[in-house]
């Protein structure tokens, strides 16, 4: 569906509701605001295929800006507002953005960027500052009607950089004239939304940062379907539960670290909320420990739907709760793309053997890494298969199990160790809030297993807790997979989507 169609069909129906401020944008307003943004972009000379960058917190004008770029045929790059100015500068320049849109909330970063972003037109929401125009004032006088050359744009999002510098994932823009004719919608997204039952009656809760691929794509999908998006300004366990009850949420999307935090909420508080409207809880972004998912299904019921995909969107697997209970630990079977498990020589491996996970097949999406031909080539095999860098295996029914990322593998005394199993065990210990496991140098063995733990109570960090956790590991998994030593940190460096910046921890031990 198209924002113009929805805007005419139900102009007064809420499209976006901010859970904290309770600000509302209706479908009619979403259509008009995005048209005004599109006219602004054209007035500044932007043509289909040009790029803009958006660095915003979870702001109520986020989606009017996204749809303005989309219906202008532009590439839009959403950037984490938690990045350092130098990191934002790199992405804005690399994506070749002609416009940067940010907010007063990020004024200090914006001021730093103003010094280094020559030739980029800069706008600010909720005010202005040196070098930035007010976006609201710039669009206020623009027409609310459709631009003459309306056509479909798309995102160029950057990988989170958990193993190196972020790279833009670039696909050919559709530039399909709008509004859509029947059958012209993105077939991959349409299929996913159909499976989840997205429609005009859907009320979708979005608790994660909107700049990330999953919240961005699911929100735009549910809005295009005529639904309502409930946006949490930031994730809070009780606010999320309260929002499900208050707005009668039907669909939601999470990451495993949110589940871990949910499960640490006192049971007496959990049971205060009516979650009966909740039909579909989607999760991805990082592997979910089996014990965590078991407890979430026990609590919420068999409404959890997991998928495995990346910003590259070169393939996707899906699994519902019933399938998962029969294949615990799996991330599903391919929805599109075909799965291949390959050894280091690119040869197919049999069922049950661990190797690199690759997507291929005619229905897999083709992509390239913007301005990085070498990285694009390294992600592809001679057969044309592409990988997200994960390691795993297939069972006899074709279900995929992820073992870990290839770059995280520890080689100790010639034995390959994947730290995910150790992490999944440690995170379930009642005194552990978060954990990272990786290899550190060992003169005799090459590498040894190291854990860095974020304790629930920082005052307990020390030799006694270290000994307790190491003993706990050795009681439940083999000693070779158990950490030789454990260090403690107040907080681990996680991306807001739940991905762990393990290299930031690991690099300290390899210098």
Describe these PLM feature segments:
Residues 177-207, 211-251, 265:
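Conserved AMP-binding/adenylation subdomain of ANL enzymes
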Residues 2-26, 127:
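AMP-dependent adenylate-forming
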